[in-house]
């Protein structure tokens, strides 16, 4: 009898404690799997501790599709990997406009004009997102040792880079590792090259017209920019394995070969993603480094993700404003392996990771004069930016100098037929 009473009392106390101690989730955030997820979740824990709001982060391989197919989900805040997805969800009335969550004054003080424009719907004229993170594309990576061996040249423009390449290139001394093969997505790296050339040679106005599909690829600025890719990849003895290798070998090989003493290449043209594929036994600044795509301008092409709101209440509004605040991520950025670069231009917390810090410096300069531009291929209609443009550039590189220069008008006209 005593044992039975003890068990009943024990169960009552346990259940009561569990009931009163349990706090339901107040705000659910959903988004992609990300590097440094553990550090992001620690930042969410800091918000929990300061506000008393319980937060949960859920990962999805395709958050945009999930939200479309689950229109009545419990998700309160979503991180969308590209601005096109943001406007798509906004026009479907799945996410809310920013004017319900953040003041116009705050948005203007935190974000460049361009970052606000590309999350604004052309249909409703409403902005549906606030950028969270940014990553640069416009980088030239190099082997520190090999770079010293060729005299540590400095370049003020792409033309200077081409001239040096032409003068230096000789048999068995290929200067560039430029593999771009990426399965069904082969061509996306070449679109990054094209974007760098257009932005830095023709400026933000032409770049914006092209990304908005207001000018055709057959028009001179774009056609000439494609041929400027050819001036690099078709230079004799300039590219490891020649132009034929470029579209046939996986892009991850670039960074292994770049730091291989038995491979001659000094440079590789890529973005932030290169850091994911550098050999683990090699160190930044000691073994490899980068410089911005050469230009007298601060212009940078990059990518990033966007914070959006689905369900409005005071808890969600408070958490959202904490996420975009200039103080967010202070602990995250203090870690030596942090890859977090805030899109908020006022967030200038110390970044311990030297690569991330150097990348952030370039991004801040470009944001300050509104010359940061989002990856154009991701702003275009998907049948163009994620298909026809990839195919066109892959074919252009593969067919070689004579045919490419002869058939460039046919290639661009075929591309324009998708507009």
Which residues fall in each region the model found?
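Short helix-initiation/N-cap motifs at beta->coil->alpha
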Residues: 58-67, 242-256
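Short, solvent-exposed loop/beta-turn-alpha elements that line the ligand-binding surface or hinge
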Residues: 99-110, 184, 200-224, 278-281, ...
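Hinge/lid segment of periplasmic solute-binding proteins
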Residues: 82-138
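Extracytoplasmic/periplasmic solute-binding protein
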Residues: 128-132, 162-214
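Extracytoplasmic/periplasmic substrate-recognition and gating elements
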Residues: 126, 278-343
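Conserved C-terminal helix/tail region of periplasmic/extracytoplasmic solute-binding proteins
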Residues: 353-419
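Glycine-centered hinge/linker elements that transmit conformational signals in sensory
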Residues: 208-247
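Conserved N-terminal structural module of periplasmic/extracytoplasmic solute-binding proteins
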Residues: 1-87, 403-406, 413-419
